[in-house]
Amino acid sequence: MIFPQAMSRGLARGLAGVLLLAFGAHGYARGESSVWSMKGERNTVYLAGSVHALPKDHAEFPEQLERAYKAANIIVLEVDLDDMNPLDAVKFISTNGTLPADKSLKDVVGAEPYQRVAALAASLDVPETVIAKLEPWAAALVLTQFALNKTGFDANLGIDMQITERARTDGKPVEGLETVIDQLSVFDNRSFEEQTRFLLDSADDAPKLTEDLQKLIAAWRAGNLRALEKEFLKERKKSPELYDALLGVRNRQWLPKIEALLKGDQDYLVVVGALHFVGRDGLLSLLRRDGHKAVAVPAAKPPR
């Protein structure tokens, strides 16, 4: 299957945003911080929760993140976007996310659920032929990306892309915790049953995507992880296996890599999706469980 080039860029650059949107995030109240610091023997490691897609009128860095970026010598992201070939994601989906010749998405998910998915595709101006032969996970990512495009939120304005561009300009090295193929494999390795739940949840959530993103950004800017965690745990109940694969497993894979940074002599800024910090399997809990003290970086001035 050949994907349009625009879809190639969207899937590759916006994938982290789609991962973040795999579960809804709602709620807003004043909170603590979305940036933390940990002291190594000879360095400081900053941890920052990010939002991977932002609107043009609300794309500025929170003040704590701005300070952490300036203090860091090396940047660590989920994926090193400069080291990524956008076509790798498209090739992976074409190879691994396409159903056999004798199967269709309708066969896999059932006639009635498929009609819901097809109706969403039509509302997003996505030809049905684009999704008809995709596995459920791939169809979900494609439709979520098109839905994201219609909200006015742009992955190119997300914190990851902004930091990548600034680091390039400032000459700061950028490293990745994983690859885009690692991220896509999380979905590809799920059963069709789990994939179908993910697809249908994505279809149900699409109409309120703009509202959900606005609430997510408000909570993120306020550093209100408690509000995110409360709603996220409710969403987790819908698909605990996928939740663990998307966040818990990846957090545990990242943990030793982040802990190794504390043994260096350079200051690091680690930036990953905000939802990776919430819950018992969140990075903050895992790090504290291993004896590391992560201290919230306070705002220099009250939020507006």
Residue ranges and their predicted role:
Residues 2-15:
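Bacterial N-terminal signal peptides that target proteins for export
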Residues 12-25:
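Bacterial N-terminal signal peptides
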Residues 30-246:
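Structured, acidic catalytic/metal-binding patches in enzyme active sites
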Residues 241-304:
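A cross-kingdom marker for long, charged
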